Amino acid sequence: MFRWSWCRLIISKVSAESYVDYLQNSDRELPALSEIFPRHGTGTGELVKFHSLLCEAMKDHNFNYVGIKVVPPTSPPLQCLRATEPVCVPIFSNSFQGSVFSAKQHRIQFVEPLFVIRLGRDPPTQLTANTVPAVCDAFFPGVEFVGSRYPFYPPHTTGFAADLGGCVAVHLGEAVSLGSASLESLGDTNFVVTRREEPIQVGAGKNCLGGPGAAVALAVSYAASMGWPLREKHYIFCSGVGSRSPALAGEYKVNYGAYGSVSASLT
């Protein structure tokens, strides 16, 4: 039994390393994602273990673990997969690549707005939505470029989560201190997404699990279950706050009005 468990751990580490090669767009031949990712239907424990080993592998490759992305079941990708529960995935420093991207080179399929919170201190491993504001210090408007390491789209929620929710790149605007704005009022604030100065969608932070408080609490809990707890200066990336827009060339801007904006371009 011990030998079987040890062999399985080694295989899991190899799988995480192989996925790092996918994230780095390696030229060498890689195993199919179905051979790397946890099997669908095996339960959340295998996915949590994969994410934990991936955090370790990314650290070995000098990519910092920067936070957790929360994807609600109301988001377009999870609705397509008929998911009933939210998905959490770790995000790493390789996602922060500047503000100009190539849809073809980076295999970007969609552009999505983000509602991003930064922790101002180490949180306890269990939070409630009411106690979340005490550990948060800043809000950032964000934009995410989304694709898939699958040939087209993930076939199920396990694949979606193992593939980090399709995250290719993230770009953030300037920080807004939560001393000057409450978390819930920010969550109620509508934003507008434009492409080439033409509005293409609207949304609000509350579209992620009803408000940022619930999203932060879930992210903190999931990070603790991975064995990689969130710390001061880590981020919570609230996804599903708007719709997905097809990745077309042009400058995209997510505008929160008085709470700032962020711009990034696709070529």
UniProtKB/Swiss-Prot annotation:
InterPro entries: Fumarylacetoacetase_C_sf, Hydratase-Decarb/MhpD_sf. It is found in: Mitochondrion. Disruption phenotype: RNAi-mediated knockdown at the procyclic stage does not cause defects in RHE2 interaction with H2F1 or their association with components of the RECC and GRBC editing complexes; however, causes a slight decrease in the association of the GRBC complex with the RECC complex. No defect in mitochondrial mRNA editing. One of its GO terms (biological process) is mitochondrial RNA processing. Gene3D superfamilies: Fumarylacetoacetase-like, C-terminal domain. One of its GO terms (cellular component) is mitochondrion. Its main location: mitochondrion. May play a role in mitochondrial mRNA editing by facilitating the association of the gRNA-binding (GRBC) complex with the RNA editing core (RECC) complex. However, appears to be dispensable for mRNA editing per se. This is REH2-associated factor 2. It comes from Trypanosoma brucei brucei (strain 927/4 GUTat10.1).
